[in-house]
């Protein structure tokens, strides 16, 4: 059972999405648009069987389709060799409509970082970033077109929010990346996609239902999912407290990442506008509750900005606030600020970054300076702007 904190509002996200005044924050600039075509992963098991029946296909064909998609990353009718030849194209069109189309692919870090710009069915643009490390391969995926959080140092935040992405649009990013790894399209040869981070475009808690459905299917074993362990999936948030509480209740052992960026309300109000709705205490209370329930250490994301939030007093206050809840429940990831066009914010001096880390370490806080992968292709944290080049 989670601890109740009197300052934390109990209202917010409901099974149907968001409610009340909270909705306008997550849906700022949201335009009503047509929905993406219904994809296999958007359907319930019953809907899949019904769709198959409409095509004159028996129930067992649904499992074959699932195996093609999750087990072999196939959506091409030519690969459905276990299907009647006359039904292959019809089944592919009905269950696997094309939801994302590659526009550009940019490569950095000697071919181990790949940023892909995708066009969705309505012309919207989103990006994903695939990063190969010596011991793992991580895909950073988007969950919304744009973002309504309006953080001034983030390129995505400057776009505003266009719409939520469907489960299918989210999962297709994963399928394509998994296929790229299997087929050896990433420097280093054939491999396996091992980690997923919801740290691309958008606020995942603002598209909770689609994100959760994606998490469940990404982590389920084939033929129900891709078989990527939930422990290797990270769901990030700027501090949408109702979403954190809802995720806590799910009992899925994903890692929670909180984009804190400041240790005080005065400073965080400026850097993360959502703080005016859910303040630092409420966010940290909810994050600590997540740790209590899951025993998964929470990641605290902290973009270091020169002369803004990178001084000794900031590190000391951050350590004090985290230690208030006890030991070893959170891991801090200071992130050297990645440059974005027209921004007044700049990266911290290297010596200030190291001092910040040392202060946290002396206070008993585990902290690791984040790698800035993909910076030269605008693929690093805070740089995703979905621009055609």
Swiss-Prot record:
It catalyses: adenosine(2503) in 23S rRNA + 2 reduced [2Fe-2S]-[ferredoxin] + 2 S-adenosyl-L-methionine = 2-methyladenosine(2503) in 23S rRNA + 5'-deoxyadenosine + L-methionine + 2 oxidized [2Fe-2S]-[ferredoxin] + S-adenosyl-L-homocysteine; adenosine(37) in tRNA + 2 reduced [2Fe-2S]-[ferredoxin] + 2 S-adenosyl-L-methionine = 2-methyladenosine(37) in tRNA + 5'-deoxyadenosine + L-methionine + 2 oxidized [2Fe-2S]-[ferredoxin] + S-adenosyl-L-homocysteine. One of its GO terms (molecular function) is metal ion binding. Belongs to the radical SAM superfamily. RlmN family. SUPFAM superfamilies: Radical SAM enzymes. Reaction proceeds by a ping-pong mechanism involving intermediate methylation of a conserved cysteine residue. This is Probable dual-specificity RNA methyltransferase RlmN. NCBIfam families: rRNA_mod_RlmN. The active site is at residues 127, 381. Residues 133-376 form the Radical SAM core domain. Its cofactor is [4Fe-4S] cluster. [4Fe-4S] cluster binds at residues 147, 151, 154. Residues 1-23 are annotated as: Disordered. The gene is rlmN. Disulfide bonds join 140-381. Keywords: 4Fe-4S, Cytoplasm, Disulfide bond, Iron, Iron-sulfur, Metal-binding, Methyltransferase, rRNA processing, S-adenosyl-L-methionine, Transferase, tRNA processing. PANTHER family: 23S RRNA METHYLTRANSFERASE, RADICAL SAM CORE DOMAIN-CONTAINING PROTEIN. Binds 1 [4Fe-4S] cluster. The cluster is coordinated with 3 cysteines and an exchangeable S-adenosyl-L-methionine. Its EC number is 2.1.1.192. S-adenosyl-L-methionine binds at residues 202-203, 236, 259-261, 338. One of its GO terms (biological process) is rRNA base methylation. GO terms for cellular component: cytoplasm. Specifically methylates position 2 of adenine 2503 in 23S rRNA and position 2 of adenine 37 in tRNAs. The keyword Iron-sulfur applies. InterPro entries: Aldolase_TIM, Elp3/MiaA/NifB-like_rSAM, Methyltransferase_A, RNA_MTrfase_RlmN, rRNA_lsu_MTrfase_RlmN/Cfr, rSAM.
């Amino acid at each position: 059972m989670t601890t109740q904190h009197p300052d934390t509002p109990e209202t917010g996200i409901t099974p149907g999405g968001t409610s009340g005044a909270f909705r306008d924050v997550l849906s700022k600039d949201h335009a009503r648009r047509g929905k993406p075509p219904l994809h296999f992963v958007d359907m319930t098991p019953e809907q899949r069987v019904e769709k198959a029946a409409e095509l004159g296909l028996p129930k067992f064909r649904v499992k074959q389709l699932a195996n093609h998609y999750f087990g072999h990353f196939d959506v091409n009718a030519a690969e459905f060799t276990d299907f009647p030849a006359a039904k292959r194209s019809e089944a592919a069109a009905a269950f696997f409509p094309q939801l994302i189309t590659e526009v550009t692919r940019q490569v950095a870090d000697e071919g181990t970082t790949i940023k892909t710009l995708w066009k969705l069915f309505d012309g919207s643009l989103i990006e994903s970033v695939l990063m190969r490390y010596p011991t793992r391969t991580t895909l950073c995926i988007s969950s919304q077109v744009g973002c309504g959080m309006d953080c001034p140092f983030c390129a995505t935040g400057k776009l505003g929010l266009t719409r939520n992405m469907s489960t299918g649009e989210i999962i297709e990013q994963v399928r394509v990346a998994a296929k790229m790894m299997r087929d050896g399209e990433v420097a280093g040869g054939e491999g396996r996609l091992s980690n997923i981070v919801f740290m691309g475009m958008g606020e995942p808690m603002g598209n909770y239902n689609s994100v959760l459905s994606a998490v469940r299917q990404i982590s389920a074993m084939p033929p129900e999912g891709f078989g990527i362990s939930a422990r290797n999936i990270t769901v990030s948030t700027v501090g949408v407290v109702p979403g954190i509480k809802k995720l806590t209740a799910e009992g899925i052992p994903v890692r929670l990442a909180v984009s804190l960026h400041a240790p005080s309300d005065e400073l965080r109000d400026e850097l993360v506008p959502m703080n005016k709705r859910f303040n630092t205490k409420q966010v940290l209370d909810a994050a600590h509750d997540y740790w209590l329930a899951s025993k998964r250490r929470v990641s605290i994301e902290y973009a270091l900005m020169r002369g803004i939030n990178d001084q000794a007093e900031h590190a000391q206050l951050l350590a004090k606030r985290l230690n208030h809840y006890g030991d070893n429940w959170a891991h801090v990831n200071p992130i050297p600020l990645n440059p974005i066009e027209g921004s007044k914010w700049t990266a911290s001096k290297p010596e200030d970054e190291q001092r910040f880390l040392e202060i946290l370490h002396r206070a008993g806080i585990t902290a690791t300076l984040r790698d800035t992968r993909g910076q030269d292709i605008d693929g690093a944290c805070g740089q995703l702007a979905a621009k055609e080049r």
